[in-house]
């Protein structure tokens, strides 16, 4: 159980996503990394299929459903997250399923739909805490339907039971942590915030990460999605009815409001739910324009086609354009082999091997029996490559950064060659770190640790 919880709190445990990933590990092709990356693509495929159905249900036109899914599929964040092992695409898969049930519940209120919606939202909570952002809207919808006597009052209790059933895996982990730590509130806080309470509850925009995340986020909108969405929002009440329009707009505002003030390095990845909601509004906008006249219908079809064709071309050309303009993009921590612009701007990753190249070179440098002290970013590539090529560097030890000095560690480090992936990693007590020299030769990828006064 503790392997699922980890050291960063329940909020980043994602237990159902881990179970989904374990299922994909049974695939008979590719290595572990390929299978888990493939799982992200499958999750996004489910979400896109749901989006097509959602847009069809909102507009009554199949071609709008297909066009909406295609436009969303080539958005930068969507494509980027579909190629790497991350949790967000599966959150989108469950979220779009929830939206299908929400529309059904509002248009044809039945207690079964309410329970199914709550159950699916509970499952999604076991995937990612982003599921909780739409929960207040669902609760308000249920209360309104009960107040209007379109649902029986006991449907609220049944829905609550459905949510608890869906989130049973996560709730079990909360109970386990509470019993282990002897503190229920600490377990609940871990489930809701993990170690990121100040960031989750942040009420202002952080400029530290805003610059590059804004640039990456804007790549999602090199199309006609925003003007189509604006038209859709203005026409949503007329096309969908005030109740459904209010619910969809409320979910959009909550998700977009959350991501704009969530100060984390990968802030742009949290845009995915907002992009889903924006494209649903865009589908309504397409319908509004298509209804005006034949000329408008042709024009909006052309806009949809451009929105599918142009983004990949822009992604491919952007690194070259940045190079020609002389703009320098550097990180505080430079990673060997990684072209930062190519890594972040181009969403397809089938030919991006910087992590693999680094791991191969690092393990070779640490031969025959060195110790590599790694941060979290480099740790898993090192371990995966070592497991894959188990005859290359079997005696090399890869250690995740641990700032807690342990008895005997200094003596072990004195007996073996020691390397760090970054020069600022503090892996020993300050008084001992002051007595080591960390340097890297020109052709090396790791920094060697040399004791100046053993």
Predicted features by range, described:
Residues 68-70, 113-128, 136-140:
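Membrane-interface alpha helices of multi-pass inner-membrane proteins
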Residues 38-59, 97-101, 233-234, 280-284:
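Transmembrane-helix motifs of polytopic, lipid-linked glycan transferases
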Residues 80-88:
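Short acidic/glycine- and proline-prone juxtamembrane loop motifs at membrane-interface regions
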Residues 46, 51-74, 93, 112, ...:
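Transmembrane-helix signature of polytopic, membrane-embedded enzymes
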